[in-house]
């Protein structure tokens, strides 16, 4: 691992920073409301047709617009999925979904989770994939970025009452950022062999004389926004492990870059908009250090594999189970950490087949709130919540009122911060307990013991933190799990967004105080260390007991027996 593993990590980080820096500058211009002549007429036409006034909104108006927009998206997608059997672009004549699966899927894609309790090629028509899921991939990503825009403006402005206009932000993010970049990525994917057609499925005879069905469809267009918007829902059931969805090592590398591109660019944009690039760099350093350590641990665990294989005559202990040979262990490990550090959930291997330690790291990255770069928008505002918590703890230690970027952090801000940080762990732990205490929940567990517990814990962690990946050994297409996970996804998304916008509404009205002798510098290595420590401390205190019952116990069972 020493040479090739670290070379892969280094090349990934270098290319990521090279691409995200200029995009961060462009996003900063969007946040500050600079006009762009290229699509100004299109934008103006949309306002005329919709009757929307582009006047700025206060925090509660912004939150109400975001919430209503997403609730409407759930209703429309639910109806489409239920009615797909009677609609066009359905060459395989697939019927509509059951009501509980349709509800779960609608909530999943609107909340940017993309949890899939179904296999796309066997369940969804082309119309549902294009007009339903792909559209929500764009809109859910735009929602997360818009909330991040509002919070950044709250730190940059002072003595103000407004955070921007939600409708303007959603449209401009989609028109100027998501659509152009997704088009470029889709063309790259097509060049690598990703499908993009509306043909019916192919029925062929293999060389062995066996009949086989090859699914077709508009894959590349959905795949591009799947990774760019950190959505993660695959066109096929195997997701990015499927050769029609992720055929080459290059397409695999592009997917990983696309997942982190906007989250990293938003950190650069944050520093530029608040007038101190060191603030954005500090966030990137904290995220990068946690990320690199996580990748190294997963690579080590998967290369170490299972010690019981060598005595049985295996050539290597390394764990290739559930992995694609065209990617190998190192690229697969990197992808697993990227997709769970971000709220993406796309997979190019089966996480359920990882070693206990290798599977624990992706699980833990979700449980800390996916703040290591994180989802588009959600990663930045999630890490800024930990920044506020860090300056509060530092203020307690030195006996000063906490402040960040010249703004005092008061009781209301800390209440909302605590609420936003604690809502997802509460859902995860209560949901896991409910699943294990009921017959309907236990019925879906395939593997007994510690790994079966890990499957349930992973499902709730993935849903509540809007990731969408899974330990696929758990059978979740049941009314119990569809409804439980739908509730977890909805509360996990908006139970964080609403407190974040409440914090933004509070901060934007405050005056900016000049830095004094007792002000904690938040752009240096000391603060980066404090921030990392806070993230690790909160994650440890919350989830160590649950992790001890699952992946830690499983890891000890394997190695102590050896």
Swiss-Prot record:
It is found in: Cell inner membrane. It is a multi-pass membrane protein. Keywords: Cell inner membrane, Cell membrane, Ion transport, Membrane, Potassium, Potassium transport, Transmembrane, Transmembrane helix, Transport. GO terms for molecular function: P-type potassium transmembrane transporter activity; potassium ion binding. The keyword NAD does not apply. One of its GO terms (cellular component) is plasma membrane. Its main location: membrane. The chain crosses the membrane at residues 6-26, 63-83, 132-152, 175-195, 253-273, 283-303, 327-347, 356-376, 379-399, 416-436, 483-503, 526-546. Belongs to the KdpA family. The system is composed of three essential subunits: KdpA, KdpB and KdpC. Part of the high-affinity ATP-driven potassium transport (or Kdp) system, which catalyzes the hydrolysis of ATP coupled with the electrogenic transport of potassium into the cytoplasm. This subunit binds the periplasmic potassium ions and delivers the ions to the membrane domain of KdpB through an intramembrane tunnel. HAMAP family: KdpA (MF_00275). NCBIfam families: kdpA. This is Potassium-transporting ATPase potassium-binding subunit. It comes from Yersinia pseudotuberculosis serotype O:1b (strain IP 31758). The gene is kdpA.
């Amino acid at each position: 691992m020493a040479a090739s593993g670290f070379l892969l990590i280094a090349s990934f980080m270098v290319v990521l920073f090279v691409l995200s820096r200029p995009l961060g500058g462009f996003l900063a211009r969007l946040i500050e409301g600079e006009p762009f002549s290229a699509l100004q007429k299109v934008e103006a036409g949309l306002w005329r047709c919709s009757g929307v006034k582009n006047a700025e909104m206060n925090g509660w108006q912004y939150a109400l617009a975001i919430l209503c927009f997403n609730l409407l998206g759930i209703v429309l997608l639910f109806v489409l999925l239920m009615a797909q059997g009677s609609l066009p672009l359905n060459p395989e004549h697939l019927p509509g979904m059951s009501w509980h699966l349709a509800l779960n899927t609608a909530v999943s894609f609107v909340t940017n989770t993309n949890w899939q309790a179904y296999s796309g090629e066997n369940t969804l028509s082309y119309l549902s994939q294009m007009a339903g899921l792909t559209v929500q991939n764009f809109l859910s990503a735009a929602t997360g970025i818009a909330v991040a825009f509002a919070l950044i403006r709250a730190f940059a402005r002072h003595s103000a009452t407004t955070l921007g206009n939600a409708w303007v932000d959603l449209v401009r993010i989609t028109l100027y950022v998501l659509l152009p970049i997704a088009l470029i990525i889709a063309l790259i994917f097509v060049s690598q062999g990703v499908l993009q057609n509306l043909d019916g499925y192919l029925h062929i005879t293999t060389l062995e004389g066996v009949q086989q069905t090859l699914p077709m469809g508009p894959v590349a267009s959905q795949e591009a926004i799947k990774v760019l918007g950190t959505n993660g829902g695959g066109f096929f059931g195997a997701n990015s492990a499927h050769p029609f969805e992720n055929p080459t090592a290059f397409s695999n590398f592009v997917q990983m870059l696309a997942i982190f591109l906007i989250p990293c660019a938003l950190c650069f944009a944050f520093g530029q908009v608040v007038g101190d690039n060191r603030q954005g760099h500090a966030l990137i350093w904290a995220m990068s250090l946690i990320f690199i350590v996580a990748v190294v641990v997963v690579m080590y665990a998967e290369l170490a594999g299972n010690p019981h294989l060598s005595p049985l005559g295996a050539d290597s202990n390394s764990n290739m189970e559930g992995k694609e040979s065209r990617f190998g262990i190192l690229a697969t490990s990197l992808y697993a950490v990227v997709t769970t550090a971000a709220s993406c959930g796309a997979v190019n291997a089966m996480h359920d087949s990882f070693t206990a330690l290798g599977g624990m790291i992706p699980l833990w990255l979700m449980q800390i709130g996916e703040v290591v770069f994180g989802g588009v928008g959600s990663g930045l505002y999630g890490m800024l919540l930990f920044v506020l918590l860090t300056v509060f703890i530092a203020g307690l230690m030195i006996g000063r009122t906490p402040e960040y970027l010249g703004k005092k952090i008061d009781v209301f801000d800390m209440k909302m911060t605590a609420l936003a940080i604690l809502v997802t762990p509460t859902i995860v732990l209560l949901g896991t307990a409910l699943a294990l205490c009921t017959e309907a929940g236990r019925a879906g567990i395939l593997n007994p013991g510690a790994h079966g517990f890990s499957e349930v814990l992973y499902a709730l962690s993935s849903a509540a933190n809007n990731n969408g990946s899974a330990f696929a050994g758990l059978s979740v297409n049941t009314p119990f799990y569809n409804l439980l996970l739908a509730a977890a996804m909805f509360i996990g998304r908006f139970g964080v967004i609403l407190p974040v916008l409440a914090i933004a509404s509070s901060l934007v009205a405050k005056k900016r105080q000049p830095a004094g002798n007792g002000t904690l510098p938040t752009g240096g290595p000391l603060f980066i260390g404090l921030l990392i420590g806070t993230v690790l401390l909160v994650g440890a205190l919350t989830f160590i007991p649950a992790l001890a019952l699952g992946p830690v116990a499983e890891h000890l069972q394997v190695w102590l027996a050896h």
